[in-house]
Every structure is written in structure tokens, then in C-alpha cells.
Amino acid sequence: MTITLGKRVLLTKEKIDKISYSLYLFVLVFAPPIVPYPHLFLTIFSFLMLVTTYKRKVWIVLKRSGIYNWVLAMGLLAMYTVCVPLPISMLCNDIVNTSHYISVINRYGVLIVAVSVCVTYLLCKTDRDGYGYEFLLESLINAGVIEGVCAALAFLFPGVKSIFIFFMKQFSASNLYSNTWYITVRSYGFASTLVDVFGLGAALIAGICFFYGITRKKIYMAESIVIAIATILNSRTGLLVYLISIVLSLLYVLQKGDIRKIISTFIAIGLLIIAGSKILDIMSTNEYTAGWFQAGIKSIQNFMSGNRTSNTSGDAMSMLFQDNFWKFPTFPRIIFGTGHSLYGAEGYAHSDVGYVNEIWLFGILGCLLLYGKIIEMCGMMKKSTRIPVFDYAAVFLLISYFFFNIKGAALGYNPGAVVMFFIIFVGTYQATSYE
């Protein structure tokens, strides 16, 4: 379908398709709560399309993309958890509140179902429509740009933020939108969650976008800045992930030795510094958000210089590295796991740290399977691909995942995990399709 005005072509079929793909990915990644659980509707729609329109293609896509093997690995991890850590916890009289187990099942179950179904559908549809990996990556970037614009509008116009907060409070499961401090200092954007995992997702898209800009299409270097606004306003950890992407991009082009791309990268970094300073100037107009951002910078500086404070409530790094946050199960349960984490488990001190929660949940044995599978998938993508952006993404995603897991659990249905697996499966599929 093409939309014209007289003899002038306004929108080609490809542009119309890119709009629809971009909106689809915006809902899949960020789950903007226009209605309750929008990702659920998306998953049901995608499943119905797979069993009707694409039923002959599904198995090929599942195998070539690596989705099938990932689902098997996660299923094996679930069986291990039910058969080993949980019975041991029953014998030790260490069964926690039922709501915690439900949240764990929801955390991993929704991620596996939504990502496997929706990414399979997108790959099937992309093949049928005759588009390649660039089309999907650019659609993902567009989804990030939409979120970046939403974040900027929410910061600049309080009325827009109030509308977003209304929907997020009504139709998302997070209680944070009833927290006066949180909605005053942060919560800029429109998504089911705007905490650190949101910042991780936005930073991953912005990082891929930056590299794509210096290696393929220059306009994406500018779009990278727009996407980064979402993480700057909501997640200091996400900003660090974005900085990692810039360093890795520079190292990548230096290693390849392409003078033109090296020059382009340094120019892009210079423009980023200028744009970043302007964004910080605008942020300073809101004393609460600016104060929160500056407190994070000061916390990192104090930590690096060894000046830890006993007042963890106002110091992010001191809170993160307090003893309670790094308490592991005793031997031998540290090996096998307990079947529950510390996040929301009654009778246990809370911890945000991803590694700590996952070792409590799965034990060292389960974590070897969990982390090993992620390393294997990224390694396979890097080994098999001939496309620079996926070669770069394999390293960037791995470093970002293991770095972020210090701050919080990266896995679960959230923007960070969805973006990571989307890129891995698209990258693996395009590589195996050319074999």
C-alpha cells in the first residue's frame, strides 16, 4: 500500500510497515500502559498469527534464531528449581510467602513466553515482507526514539507527565507511581516500569544506535542522543551502560583501522559531549532531578576514592555495597539454591543485587546454566555473523548484562531483557539464514 497526494508519494509500503513494526516493538519493549498488560494482548495476537498465517515458518525460525534452544534451557532451569532447591527448602523449613513464588514465576515466565512468541512472529513477518536485519534494527531504534521523546516531553511539560503518571498508576503493577518522591524526582517517560531496568533497555538501544550510526547511517548518531534522554532522566546505571557502548564503539573502529570511521567516531563523541552538557543544563532547571543526578555522581566519586558513608539512605553506592545486600546462602545451599530470592521474600533482608538474588534462587549450579546460556548465545552470534553491528552487539550485550546485574536483576520481563534477547535472536537468525 502506498499513500499519495496527487502525483506525490507521501508514504511508501516500506515506510508504513516501518511505522507498524516500530509501534509493535515500542509496546513489546516498554509495555506503555495505555491498557492493563499491553504486552499480553501483543503476545496473544502474535500467537494467533503464528498458528494461522505463519504455521509453516514457525519451526524454521525457532531453530535458526536460537529461540528454541533458549526456551529449552530456561525450561530445564525451571525443572531443576522445582526438583532440587524447593524440596531442600521444604526439608529446611524455609518456604517463604506464596506471593514471592508467584512473582518469580511471573518474572521469568512472562519474559520467556512474550519474547519467544513475539520475536518469532516478527522474524516470520519480516521474511514474508522481504525485509532484512536493518529494517528490524531501525524499527527497534524508532521504538527507543519514541520513548526518548516521551521522556523529554514529560520533563519539559508537567501536564504531559501528569497524563503519563495517570495511566501508569492506573494500569501498571508498580506501586512507585504512588510514591511522591519518585514521581517528583524521576518517572519521565511512558512505560510499565521506569526504574533501572528501563534505563538498561533504553541504554542498550541507544548504544546499538550509536554504533549503527558510525558504521552505517550517520543520522542514527543523533537519534542515539534522543534515546539516551530516557535513561539520563530515569537511570544513572543506564547512563553508565550508554557510556560503555561509546567506549566499545571507539575500540571497535580503532581495531578495524578504518580512518574515516575513526574520525567519524571522534566527531560523534565530541557532539555527544556538547549535547550532553546542554541536556544537563536543561536538567538543572528542575532542582529535584538535578539533585538526584548529582548525588549519584558524588556517590560514585566517594566510592572510587574509598570514602564510604554509614548513611546508606542518601548514598547509592554505599547502599548497593552494604553487607545485607551481599548475603549469600550457607553451604551447601549456596551450591543448589533455595528456590527463592531475597527480593520480596518475607523473613529475609532485602537485596537488589542480581547475582545475590539469582544464587539464592538457583544456586551456583543453576546460575552456571543461566549465565552460561547467555554467554553461549552471544558467543554464537559473534562467531557466526558477518555484520559489524551484531559482532559489536555480542560484546556490548554481555558486558552490559553482567555489569548491570551488580545493581539489580537484569532478567525478567523488562525493557533491558527484552532488548537483549531481541538483538541476540535477530542477530543469530540473520547469520544462520546465510549458511
Specify the residue positions occupied by each region the protein language model found:
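Hydrophobic transmembrane helix bundles of membrane-integrated enzymes that assemble
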Residues: T2-Y288, A349-E435
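Generic alpha-helical secondary structure signal
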Residues: G130-E134, G291, D315, M319
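Rossmann-like dinucleotide/flavin-binding elements
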Residues: W292-G296
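Long extracytoplasmic/lumenal interhelical loops at the membrane interface
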Residues: I300-F362
